[in-house]
Amino acid sequence: MPILQRASHHELRSAFRALLASERCYHTASVFDPMSARIAADLDFEVGILGGSVASLQVLGAPDFALITLSEFVEQAARIGRVARLPVIADADHGYGNALNVMRTVVELERAGVAALTIEDTLLPAQFGRKSTDLISIEEGVGKILAALEARVDPELSIIARTHAGVLEVDEVIRRTRAYEAAGADGICLVGVKDFAHLEQIAAGLKVPLMLVTYGNPELRDNQRLARLGVRIVVNGHAAYFAAIKATYDCLREQRGAQPCDLNATELTHKYTMPEDYILWAKEFMEVRE
């Protein structure tokens, strides 16, 4: 397909559902603007993802503390949606509020052209006196998934329920994933899976496709084994975005006649977003516990 030729949003959603229905495991391209989306499609990636953390960096220059608003996130998704030739998953965080806010989130992101979106059960934004890793109840999580399904117009839009396997006992992860599957989620997204033994416990009995956020975990690199366990989508992280930060810094530094710098992309991101300040403010003003 020529670079400037676009597919319809419905066609891209159908293409994403075909990935979920396949027996393969696909790795996402991190897309954060129209250019990165075009590059990913031209390099024959089957699917892209707009991460909430990356959107916060790109739009606000801020770390991932649930600071970006729905309208800001949707605007960035729409810019990508105008040119996308591959299905794009939107990391919709907690749906930007309660179940009614989730409905609004689905309406806006569907209109922006995303092929799928994830709704997570993390308690966001961080609440006064609570742990930053706290989750909402299963009942509230189910309500959000039901609300998302009610709000979508195009039945090809995939609603994926996301939970954090790294902060819960495995029995609780199983309860949550089963509940979200029963509510009608088109897929389950898991964060924090430690290894294949952990994944096998969670995946046993699940019929919906799985999406895995691994951040490059070396314990989860066997694509064929992942596929056999029902994993269809893997998010390794957002290396392309951080490489762009590093390249920009190095290029501008060279233009100023400075010597090469040995700061890596992670260190540069910390330097210019100052996450330590946000952590300090959360503790000082909200008594948030890590």
Curated annotation (Swiss-Prot):
CDD domains (UniProt xref) = ICL_PEPM
Question: Which leading EC class covers this enzyme?
Answer: lyase
Residues noted as binding Mg(2+) in the record, renumbered to the chain: 91
UniProt superkingdom: Bacteria
Catalytic reactions on record: oxaloacetate + H(+) = pyruvate + CO2
Tell me the GO BP annotations in alphabetical order. oxaloacetate metabolic process; propionate catabolic process, 2-methylcitrate cycle; pyruvate biosynthetic process
Cite the cofactor comment. Answer: Binds 1 Mg(2+) ion per subunit.
**So what family is this one in?**
Belongs to the isocitrate lyase/PEP mutase superfamily. Oxaloacetate decarboxylase family.
Q: What is this protein called?
A: Oxaloacetate decarboxylase
Q: Which species? A: Ectopseudomonas mendocina (strain ymp) (Pseudomonas mendocina)
